[in-house]
Amino acid sequence: MRKTLLISFIVPAFNAQSTLTGCVRSIVRTMSSCRSNYEIIIVDDGSADDTPRLAQSLAEEIEEVTVVTQENRGLGAARNHGIDEANGLYVAFVDADDEIKASGIVDFSLLNGSFDILCIPILRVTSKGKTSVYGSTTQRIPFGKRFDEARDYLRHRNVIPCACAYLWRRETLLTRFHEDIYHEDEEFTVMSLLHGGTLICTNQLFTYKYICRPDSITTSSENAGKRLADIATIIGRLETYASAHPEQKRYMRTKLLWLHIDYLRQRLRYHR
């Protein structure tokens, strides 16, 4: 029987030799008061650089780290693989080029199974080291706010789409990431919130540090065409779901509107 842990941190890694070690060590530092009750699952997504060796070295050094490998199938597939391997009561996603840091007050008792989803702060860090709170202009939800149904958090709100902004109770996480597309978080997060139970917004666990890099998949102009096409695909899939499930449509309207706005912004940005 597999031991049930508190949190499974899923770290997809593709050609991440320059950032993987910093990412993993940030998790270890953050969880220092909860040692041996968590795991870090590095999913090597067919890396062609030194990532596999670094991952194995970290696993040999840190007992909470395990490594699984797959052929290069993309971020969504790597996250799905990690979910299948996870043993934690909760699942947290941390991209290999990002980090986390402990909050001033850490209260792991929040992770007692009472909440299906916990929304945590995201700090955007630029390449010059400037920081800002990600999503602060669209969220406006006080920490400690609870929702009996996660879809009430989604309603009338342009929720942060990043799956890394939430901890997900593994047993209730029914949605999987759509593979082979960019912006897979947009669909995953909406569908997970629609079907999730209790949700709380908290700053008493840890903060996710989203480190902006000019060469990342979601910012590089080289991928603009595919990103636009994939946003359109996601909008189409969500609208199809909304049409088939009218009882859910009212919870999706605001997010769908913002997705359309984002699509138009991207077109104007890259197709002037």
Q: What is each PLM-predicted segment?
A:
Residues 204-272:
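C-terminal subregions of glycosyltransferases and related glycan-biosynthesis enzymes
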Residues 75, 96-203, 208-228:
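Donor-binding/catalytic cores of nucleotide-activated saccharide
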Residues 26, 44-54, 95:
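A conserved acidic beta->alpha catalytic loop
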Residues 18-22, 49-58, 99, 103:
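Acidic helix N-cap motif at the loop->helix transition within catalytic regions
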Residues 6-8, 39, 187:
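Cell-envelope/extracellular polymer assembly enzymes that use nucleotide-activated donors
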Residues 91:
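Short aromatic/hydrophobic "clamp" motif used to bind/position activated sugar donors
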Residues 16-31:
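Short, well-formed alpha-helical segments that are part of the catalytic scaffolds
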Residues 70-86:
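Glycine-rich, basic loop-to-helix element that forms the pyrophosphate-binding segment
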